[in-house]
Each structure stands twice: as structure tokens, then as C-alpha cells.
Design a protein with these regions (language model features):
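Phosphopantetheine-dependent thiolation modules in NRPS/PKS and related acyl-activating systems
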Residues: 2-39, 49, 53-84
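Two-component histidine kinase catalytic core, primarily the HATPase_c
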Residues: 43
């Protein structure tokens, strides 16, 4: 899976499942999940679960705190690395 596809799917999760924006067009790759999108700790756990299910990868609780979930771009890099 290409990074663009991963990035687009993550943005879709943020809009369709977590309701953090009205449209994927409102979310830039550099958007900070906590600061810019207002995600709280429960949202981070929900996103980690969704990412694991959608991409078929293991996401540990420590991955959230290790900085992989700070922005859309960082999360895209994390998922891409786990897929390859």
C-alpha cells in the first residue's frame, strides 16, 4: 500500500469514525491530532484500535506515547513502516 493511500485512509478514519472534521479536505498531513484536531486520550486509543483493525497491524499502547500518533504524517509513516 502506498503512503498516499495510507494517509487518505487515516484521514477518512478521523472524519468518518472519530468525527474530528467535516471533510478529509479539512485535514492537512501536518495536522497535529491533539492540538489541531482536538483529539483527547480516549480518541487516541480509539484511533490506535481502528488503525490496527483497518491496516492489520499490531499497535501497542506505547506506540501512542512514542510520538507515532502526533500528526497524520507521523501516523502514516508509522503504518507504512509496519506494513513493510
Amino acid at each position: 500500500m502506498e503512503k498516499k493511500e495510507i494517509n487518505d485512509r487515516i484521514k477518512s478514519l478521523l472524519v468518518e469514525d472519530l468525527f474530528l472534521a467535516d471533510s478529509v479536505d479539512e485535514i492537512s498531513g501536518g495536522a497535529e491530532l491533539g492540538t489541531d484536531l482536538g483529539m483527547d486520550s480516549v480518541g487516541f486509543v480509539e484511533l490506535a484500535t481502528l488503525v490496527g483493525e483497518v491496516f492489520g497491524i499490531k499497535v501497542a499502547d506505547t506506540d501512542i506515547g512514542d510520538g507515532h500518533f502526533t500528526s497524520v504524517d507521523r501516523l502514516t509513516e508509522f503504518v507504512a513502516a509496519r506494513l513493510h
